[in-house]
Amino acid sequence: MKLEEATCGCAAQTKPGRKAVAVDPEIKDSNLKRLRRIEGQVRGLQRMVSEEQYCAEVLVQISSVQEALRSVSRELMRNHLQHCAARAISKGTREEAAAMYEELLDLMYRHAR
């Protein structure tokens, strides 16, 4: 399957008029694998709290989960910028480009927190 024919990993279908563009199937598989690993880490955290393990150890594991989520987030953002945003800005209407700029600003503000 060509990259252009794939669907984007973003939630483009949740907004009327938005079209998903592309995601590399290998990136999608990699992100899903990472998310499953994170899910396992979170289950481990639940067990640690349930078993009243030492707070510092729990906090170290929480930090590990947060970094893993940031890694997935960066990969999704990269894909969104390279495909969805690039297409909306270069080939979309002025309104679509403006909406994409607003969306990107919102995403940057959210990730900067």
Residue ranges and their predicted role:
Residues M1-R113:
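Solvent-exposed interaction patches of small proteins and small membrane subunits
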